[in-house]
Structure formats: C-alpha cells, structure tokens
Amino acid sequence: MEQPHKRKRKSHELSNSQPSDREPATSTSANAREGDFMEGAIVRITMHNFLTYDHSEVFPGPKLNMIVGANGTGKSSIVCAICLGLAGKTSVLGRGDKVGLYVKRGCQRGSVEIELYRTRGNLIVTREIQVENNQSTWMLNKKHASQKAVEEAVRELHIQVGNLCQFLPQEKVGEFAKMSNSELLEATEKSVGPPEMYEFHCELKTFRTKERDLENVCKEKGNFLEKARQRNERNKLDVERYYMKKRHLDRIQMLEKKKPWVEYETARKELEGVKKERDEMKRKLRFLKEAQEPLLRKIRSVESELQPIEQQMKEMTNRIKEATQKCKQKHDQLELKNKEVDDIKQDMSLKQTEEADRQKRIGHTQLMIRDLQKELQNMGTIEDVTPQIEAINAELRNIQEERARLESESLDLRRDKDEITGEFARLQNRLRSLDDMMKIKEEKLRSRFRDTYTALEWLRKNRDRYEGVVHEPMMLVINVRDARHAKYIETHISVNDLRAFVFQRQDDNDKFMNEMRDTQRLRVNSIIAPTESCSKRPPSRPIETLKPYGFISYLREMFDAPEEVMSYLCHQYRVNDVPIGTEKTKGMIESVIKDLQLRTIYTAEERYNVKKSAYSNNVVSSNSALRPPQFLTTTIDVEERRQLEEQLRAAERQKQSIDQRMAAIREQQANLDRRDNELRANKKKLSDLKSKKRQLEQKISTKQDSLRQMEQNEINLVAIEEEANAKIAAVNNKKVTIMGEYLSHLQSKARLNMEKVYLALQSAGLSAEKTKLETDVRESSAELKRAEVDYTKLDKIKTNLLMTCKTLMKRASEICNMTPGETAVPEELHAAFSLLPETLDEIDAMLNEERTRAECFTGLSDAVVDEYNRREQEIKNLEKELDDKTNELTTYRRNIAEAKERWLNPLKKLVELINVRFSDFFQSMQCAGEVDLHSENEEEYDKYGIRIQVQFRRNTRMHELTPHHQSGGERSVTTMLYLMSLQELNRCPFRVVDEINQGMDPVNERRVFDIVVRAACGVNTSQYFFITPKLLQNLQYAEQMTILCVHNGPQMLPPNKWNEKAFIQRARRRNRT
C-alpha cells in the first residue's frame, strides 16, 4: 500500500545470523556441478558485515536459483551484494545513494566477495567498504586492483548489472515498464545481441549524424562556388573601370584634406563669440546670488518667531476641546433634568384628566338610571313564553357543546398540523444540509481526481447499463461517524482504493474499465467485491479484551459503508480486526506488541505494523505518523438520512390526513351555524317579549352598582399636586448646581478662544510676512535659475566648441601628415588648396559631385586585378574540395548501407526469435502478446525501438505496455515473460530478478513459475536468480533447480551443527502423520 510519508523503523529482539565455521553443505554440490556453469556465472557469494548479515556464504547452482525466505531475512541483501560486488552503482538498487549505508549498522567496514566461473580459472572479486569515508577497496584474485580494472574484468565476462534486462532489483521492477522503446532496444542489444550489434547501432547513429553534416557541407560549398564564379565574371568590367575611378578619388582626397582646415577656422571664430557671452552671464549670476541672501535670512528669522506661536495654538486647541467636552456633559445633564420635570408634570396632568373623566361618567350614569326607571314604570304585563325559550335554550346548549367539541378538535388538528409543518421544514433543512455535505465531498473528488469525477458523472447517467450493484468511489460512500477518526481510515486505506469504483460483478467491471480506459482515455480505478460477503466477519477477539491496553474500538466500527464496500475492506484491509488505541496504548506499546501479537495497531497519532518471523520468535515493528485526513472529514450519517426520508414521508401522510379531517369539521360547523342562527332568531323574538322588563331591572341594578363604584374611586388632586411640586423643586435645585458648573466651563472656553484668536492674529501676521518673503525669493530664484541654466548652456557650448576645435585641428594635422605641434598649413598644399573652393558649402558640393561620380564605379579598388586572379585560383580550389566531399559522402552512404545491413538483419531475426518465445509464453497463459521492432523513419536510427503489446482478457484489444494502462500484476507478468524470452538467447552469464511475482494473482503466478522453470533449466541457458518471499503449493520443480532458503535470527542453529539425516527423517515423519 502506498505510503507517501516516511516510516521509522523499530526492531524488537532482532539479530543477524551468526558466522559459520565451515561452508554450508550446498558448496559440495555446487562444486560438483561446476562444469555446468557458463562463463561468468556466480559460483560463490561471501558477505561480511553487509546489511543484515554478520557473515554469510551463498553457493548458487548453474541454472535456476530460487532464493526463498520470509520478509526481512536478507534475500534482497544477496541482490545488493551481487550488484555492489560487481562494481555496480548504488542507483541501480534504488536504495541508499551512499555505499557506506550498505554496511551493517554499528560496524565500521564490511565486505562482499564474489567468485565468477572462468574456464581458465575462476575470478574472485572482493570489495571492502569503509563507512567513515564512504570509500571502497577492490581486489582481483586477492590482489589489490582499481575499480576501473574490476569494471573491465566484469565487462569482459558480459556482465551488465546496470541493464534491467539482466539485473532487475526489487525497487526497479516498476521502472522496466517505464522504459521507452529505444531504451528497451538498447538494453536488449546489450543483453542478448552479439557484441558487435550494439556497436553497429551506435555507429549507425554516429554515421547518420556525419552524413547530415557532409550533406550540409557539400550544399554550402556548391552554393559558395556558384557565387564565386558569378562574382568573378563581374570583375572583368571592374578592371576596365578602375583607372577612371582613380582620378575622382585623388580629387576627393585633396578636398577632404582642405575641409578640416576650413571647419577648424569656422569653429575657432564661433568659440571666441561664445566665450564673451559666457563671461557676461557669469557676472550677472554673481549679482543675483548676492541680492537674494538678505531675503533668506529674513525668512529664517520669521520662521523662528512663528514656531513657538504655532505650538501654543496647538496646546490651546486641545484645552478648548476639553472645555467643550465638559460643557457638553453639563448640557446633557440639564436636558435630563428638564425631561425629569416634564415627566412629573405629565403624570400630574394624567391624574387630573382621569378625575375629570370620572365626574363626567358619574353624571352620565345618573341620567341613564333615571331614564331606565321611567321606562320600567311605563311597562305593562307580558305573556309567559318560558317553556318555549327553555326548549330553544336546551337545543342551543346541545349545539354549543357540539360546536365546542368541534372547535377543540379543530384547534388540536391545527396545532398538530403546525407542529408537523415545522417538523417537516426542519427535516427538509437537515436533509438539504446532508446533501450539501455530499456536494463538498464530490468537490474534493473533482479538484483532486479529475478523471475519476468525469467517470462518476458518466456513471450516474449510464447506471442502467450494468446488471449488478455499482458503487461510486469509496470516499463518497464511506461515512465516518466521528470526523476525528477520519485520519485512521485514510491512513489505512490507500488513496487509489479510496477513489475506486466498487462493482458486484466481474463483467460489469470489465465493461466499465473498457469504456473508461479505451474509449474515454480516463485513468480510473475499480474494485470487485468478494463473492462471499465479509462485511459481518467478526474480529479475532472481543474489543473488551483489548480495553486494558487503551484500545477503544475496531476500525470497522468507526465508519459506515454499503455492504459490498464494507465486504471488500474487511477482506482486503481487515478493518474488522484492526484495533484503534489511545495515548495510553502508545505509552505501553512494548507490552502491546509483545502480549497481543497484533499485525496492525493504531494509537492516537501513529500506526504500527508488526511482523513476526516464521522461523523464530523475533518480532519486527515499524511505526509511522498518521496522514492528515483530506477526503473523509465531512461526515454524513447514512442511517440518519434514511430515517429523515422515512420521517418526511410519514409527516406528509399525517398532513394529508389532518387536512381531510379539518375539511369534514368545517362542513359540520357550517351546518351547526345555520341551525344556531335559526334557533337564536326564534329565541330573540320570544326573549324580546319576556326579558325586556327584567333587562331593564338588571340594567338599572348594574348602572347603580357602577355608580357606587365610581363614587368610591375619588382621586385626591391636592395631595398629588403637592407631591409633584416637591419633586419639581428638588430637580430644580440640582439644575441650579449643574447650571453653575456649565457657566464656569463656558467662561473658561470663551477665555481660551480669545487667547487662541490673539495667537492666531500673531501667526497670521507672521505667516503673511513669510509668504511675501517667500514670493520674493521664488521670483529672484526663478531669475537666478534661468541665469544658471543659461550659464550652464553657454559653458557646455564653449567646452564642446573647444573640444571640436582641438579635434578638427588634430584631424586636419593627421590628414595632412603634419608633425605634432605644427599648426600652419604645409607649403606644398597651399597651391593645391588655392585651386579648391574656400567655403564649406562649396567644398561639400564638390565632394558630393566627385563621390557620386566615383560611386558609379562600385566595387573597385587598387587590388581589383589581384582580386580577380585570386578568385580564379579560389574557384579551382573549391571545385577540388567539392569533389573530395562528394566522394567522402558517397563513401559514408555506402558504409551506412553496409552497417545497416550488418545491424538491422540480425536485429530483426533476434526480435523475431524473442517475439516467437514471448507469444508462446502468453499463449500458454491463454493470453496474447507480441514483440516487434518499431520505427517511424528507417533512416533515423536513434528512433528505433522494441514495442511490447499484450492482451490479458479476450474481450479487450491488444495494448502497448505502459506504466499506466496495465495493472501492477499484469506489468510484472509481462516483464517476467519478456526476460524469459531472452533466457535462451542471452549471452550474459546470469540474470537476477527480485520479487517480481508480487501483485500477481495465484493463477498467473503458477503459470509464470512453470515458464521460468522450463526456460531457466533448459540446455545452454544462463544462470538465473529468482528471489521471492513466498511460493505457491504443489509447484512443478526441476532437477536442475537450486533452492536457497534464507533464514535469519538469534535462535538459528549454526550450520556446523546441522544434521541432514535428522532433517530428512523429521520431514518424513511429518508427512506420514
């Protein structure tokens, strides 16, 4: 399982094998079969203080050597010894990069000695490794030698430990499938081809490069030759025009000699004028600077007076702010007191209004009583309608009771409906919350594994294509019950499985993977759940027995998953038997490992893997820190979601039932209302006749009672007014005190403001004076700056003119070949100069005219005739060089054709032989495979390569071997069968393959083993080392095989005490029982 983080290694009672006093028994048989060894095969390997060994000797057989042993016993140490002992690089092994790391821990030096078979006498190669300086000492046949000499001796025996076709260590098994076609071809040439095949290949690549260089040289020389011929044809006319041009050039030369003298005189006159202007400007500049200095002194004086005033103003402003704040506080207090007085007055006003209203109601009530008494005196006798009213009252009571019952029931139903509606909304919100959490998990999948997310979207749209159950990637369907436990699950389950789809049926899985990999070109993972469910598999022991050690649960109990997913995890990762511990567990980890003998243990922050040797009681454990969780931190309770959906359906049914019952109640209430209205109308007619007198009597009695009550509730306004006036007086006293403090602060503020105004006036006067002075300074500064700019310009012009005069004088002297220090025009030039123009314009005009005429004769010089003759000779030389290069190119092409024939024809035959054996091997496994020589361009020899194509299932097409398309087991099978295809063709003395059967299923592993035995134990085959930690039962073995069992540990019996007869007798007794 892939672990991206480093692991710490921790050993418990682990010891290496003890040094033996004599050679093992296998050495006798090995020496007896020495005649079967091929040239360069390994006869003996001796290791001293090397990796896990104190001292060990290995005597392999001449054919197939099966090196078998439990993990950690030292099988790969033998592979490392072969590589390093034969001058291999540490990079070949893919382990430590320093050779000193291969010495046993605690030792300062170690050694490896390898004896190689040779017909003229065996070769013994010894390498002693020093840890301190990470250096090695080499010996050949017990004599000191250099590493280069050892490498040469190994090369002579055709041993190539850096060739993956010959030497394939455990850490490099995966790199075989990553080799490019060109790399695989070169490795195959070195491994099984004749010695000259790889040399021919290298020559062809070199020849092709040189051929292209020669083609370019011939093309360039041909082009150059043609141009030279054309150019020389034009030179014939140039020779004739040469003398015509020479006359114009002489006149140009004389004009160019006079021109500098005219330029010098012009520049000298201009320089004199500029000097005068500059001196005048210098005097003006000095005057302006002297006039500006008094103004600057005055400005500094004003600034020194202004600074303390501004500081006082800042302090005054702060004090004014403090006084203002205090005034505001007192003002707010006065406002509060005013509001308090208003509240007291308002309360008193309310009492007065209430008393006036009471008096008014008393008068109104007395008037109503007199009116009612008068009406009662005027009434006559009324007929008795009591029986009819009582009958109506009885029916009305029944209706009222029924209405009350229906209303109560309706209220209960509405209450129930409101509760159900609220619960329904709560359930919907919770369900949406769970859906949002699932979207978060899907977003993590999309951002990390884009191909898997694309496949998920496709599956959701096409799920009906599959007959069995198909589960989405594990990270979506696994729900951790507590987010704090996600780190255990993500550490225990590989990321590749977390993003894998889980299928119930094999045919559904094949159909899905064909669609994803072949059609959509997506890199996805899939898993097939076990046929028999393992999800309910019980742990090996109850968790209660582990609680004394700090364990709280098994890993399976910390998350939920669908049946098929949980079944796979129990089967593959044994989550039902992996306990989770705490800090208490970590504190007693030694006892936990020793007493419980668990394979995998988790503490609060670490994971422990424990292995026990199959041959002793030794225990080896390794611990690593837990990975921070990335995918499962978002928890979704699946059971809660199911219950929510069920509760939503039940709530919907209850709402419908309540709505139906409420509709029936409304219908009954409507009927009762109609009957009630009819009865009340009848009763009203009867009651109006009977109860009018009684109503009048009751009204009079009621009004009289109300009148007495109002008369008793008299309000004492005088007491209330006295109490209110007392409260107002107390508040006013407090207001007077506050007002005094307010006026004091206000006066202080006013005084401070006045002081600030005085300071501001002083500051304004000084600032105005400073501004006026600064304005005057700016005006004078502007004029001064302009004067400085003008002076600088004039000084620069004067300097430039002076340099120009010197340059022109120097130039004129050089042109006229005058001696240094001479400033007058030579006498011999006066006559010639007198015939030429006197001004620059006239000289330039004549120069342009003469140059124009001379330019008509382009490409002419004094050596034009010599150039013509020289080019004629050059053309002859180029023709000869072109002929030589053309002949050389023809020879190269002939050599390339011969080398290609010598290389390509044997290579094609070799690849065809490999393909025949490779195809036969795959056919014997009921699969298909082929090997061919592939090249896009036959002339590009560095692009040739060997292409491997395989087909493991009948319903798929053949695919090229790549690191991504095939599974790890399929790549291992292909690698092994390709190496077996080279076995009989190989000219190398031995081949090493380390644990290549890891990841193979049992059927393929058995088939590959049979092929290895047949191929490696044949006639004229090289020595073969096959390292594996396990073997299947009932395998077919051959007499030519040598099985080397690797044991290790402190409880082992030393080899000098072995009794072979006792071993055999014990094995026979065991077989009989």
Curated annotation (Swiss-Prot):
Q: Which Gene3D superfamilies match?
A: 1.10.287.1490, P-loop containing nucleotide triphosphate hydrolases
Spans annotated as Disordered = 1-33, 684-705
Q: Which cysteines are joined by disulfide bonds?
A: none
Q: GO terms for molecular function, please?
A: ATP binding; ATP hydrolysis activity; single-stranded DNA binding
Q: Does the keyword Lipid biosynthesis apply?
A: no
Task: Please give the chief subcellular localization of this protein.
Answer: nucleus
A Pfam match is AAA_23
Q: Indicate which residues the UniProt annotation says bind ATP.
A: 69-76
Q: Which GO terms describe its cellular component?
A: chromosome, telomeric region; nucleus; Smc5-Smc6 complex
Q: What biological-process GO terms show up in the record?
A: cartilage morphogenesis; double-strand break repair via homologous recombination; regulation of apoptotic process involved in development
Coiled coil regions, renumbered to chain: 264-340, 389-444, 641-723, 861-902
Knockout consequences: Smc5 depletion in zebrafish embryos using CRISPR/Cas9-mediated genome editing or morpholino gene knockdown results in a significant reduction in head size and aberrant craniofacial patterning in the pharyngeal skeleton.
Location within or outside the cell:
Nucleus; Chromosome; Chromosome, Telomere
Q: What does this protein do?
A: Core component of the SMC5-SMC6 complex, a complex involved in repair of DNA double-strand breaks by homologous recombination. The complex may promote sister chromatid homologous recombination by recruiting the SMC1-SMC3 cohesin complex to double-strand breaks. The complex is required for telomere maintenance via recombination and mediates sumoylation of shelterin complex (telosome) components. Required for sister chromatid cohesion during prometaphase and mitotic progression; the function seems to be independent of smc6.
Q: Which PANTHER family match?
A: STRUCTURAL MAINTENANCE OF CHROMOSOMES PROTEIN 5
Indicate what this protein is called per its UniProt record.
Structural maintenance of chromosomes protein 5
Say which species the protein is native to: Danio rerio
